[in-house]
A protein has these predicted regions:
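Beta-lactam-recognizing serine transpeptidase/beta-lactamase-like catalytic domain environment
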Residues: 10-55, 62-180
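Conserved, well-ordered alpha-helix/loop/beta-strand core segments that scaffold catalytic motifs
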Residues: 1-10
């Protein structure tokens, strides 16, 4: 529970997979609509619809679907997945969340190991504008059909505004934001 984990808040959503329809939503702390002043102002909205966050590794499944749908790779293709991938600009790098020897991974392997470098090597082969269009079709950067008062659309900048790092990190869930 929220109390057992000493969490500030929690949310849960039940979604119909085939349609994306929200069947149920719950969050804690809750607000008594008859006495909203009984809770701090920060807890009076709905974090499910208003609190934007980076999706992180769950985005790898979205990127993998783009890779397959565009024909960029199939289930047998592999890419290098080093522990750390140095980039050709600004002394930047992409790193996996755990130290490991260099891997050569299939798309399934990238998902299994949650490899940032592997997903970058797969999904960055897709032109950024194409990936942006897929993200829009998936609903990123948009409010839900519920049009909840004060709902955040999250952040999805147009592909033309992505710098080189954003172009890469969006493949594994950074550089964009979503709500629950």
């Amino acid at each position: 529970t929220v109390n057992e984990l000493s969490a500030t808040w929690a949310s849960a959503i039940v979604v119909e997979v085939e349609t994306g329809r929200i069947l149920a939503a719950a969050e804690a702390p809750t607000v008594d609509p008859n006495d909203p002043a009984a809770v701090p102002a920060a807890d009076r909205g709905s974090r499910i619809f208003q609190a934007a966050f980076e999706p992180g590794s769950i985005m790898k499944a979205v990127s993998a679907s783009m890779v397959l749908d565009t024909g960029t790779a199939d289930e047998y293709d592999t890419v290098p997945a080093p522990d750390r991938m140095n980039l050709d600009f600004d002394d930047e790098y992409i790193k996996d969340s755990f130290s490991h020897e260099d891997f050569t991974l299939s798309l399934a392997g990238v998902l299994r190991y949650s490899s940032n470098t592997g997903m970058t090597n797969f999904a960055s082969q897709i032109p950024r504008e194409t990936r942006y269009e897929y993200l829009k079709k998936f609903g990123f950067g948009s409010v839900s059909p519920l049009r909840f008062e004060g709902e955040s659309s999250g952040i999805l900048h147009p592909a033309s505004q992505w710098d080189e790092m954003t172009n890469l990190v969006t493949t594994f869930g950074q550089g964009i934001s979503v709500t629950s």
